[in-house]
Amino acid sequence: MSSQTVNPPGYPTRRLAGRSRSALEIPVLDREPGPLGRRIASLPGEGHPVWTYVLGIIIAFVTVASLSLVTGIVVTRVLLHVQGVAGADESPVRFLARHRSGGLTDASLVGSIMAGGVVLPIVAVVAAVIALVAKHWRLAGFLLFALAVESASYRTTTLLVHRHRPEVHRLEKLPVDASYPSGHTAASIAVYCGVALLLTSRIQNRGAQIAIWAVAILIPVYVAFSRMYRGMHHPLDVAGGVIVGVAAVSALVLVTRASGSAAR
């Protein structure tokens, strides 16, 4: 008689369920939050984890917008009044404007479109829908709200911090006093670097991680140069965009971990 292992009742179900949970795990979002994240998780008391998430999003927006506003005030009211800073911030844009060509102008348009108000929302929504189909609502929220927090913080800053765009021929007709910060740069970081963070959190292959991050970093760099080439932003505006984008991604990681902790 041949021996045959008989699994206990329910064994296959548990195994498949384990695989399903593993397939949904995003380590960077599923880690236990630090002290600040635990504090956010405890704020709604015994309420539903969704309330933790909603409250966290509000805190994230207020924090990122405040950081952007303070940085913008320092740039426009302090740094630019230091002798030589304003000229140094304008000169790279003038250099790029003097060396424009048909091919470079077309390339700058592509860079702007990649981080524009049409492409990035589509990328974020499609990725979020995929996450929802996989029944990972916190991942979907991260993908959507990283861009939403970035965009709201950027818009708030441009309304309250007024800086004129570079004094060169500008290739786009946008409000002239909304130079700081670069929303395209911030949005490209929020989406492309946010997705890279999620992917490299799951992928164990070191070479693949390096390749993903290389692309995710090069895209915002390309976008930043495109915006300066087109006469829309100064280098300090781009730096402000980097701050907003990185802050938005960091805040959403914290909020997502906090909501996960509340759910557990």
PLM features per residue range, with description:
Residues 1-139, 235, 239-264:
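Terminal transmembrane helix and immediately flanking juxtamembrane interfaces
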Residues 72-74, 155-165, 222-230:
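C-terminal ends of transmembrane alpha-helices
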Residues 80, 86-87, 122-125, 130-214:
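Membrane-interface loops
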Residues 170-264:
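Membrane-embedded catalytic cores of phosphoryl/pyrophosphoryl-handling enzymes
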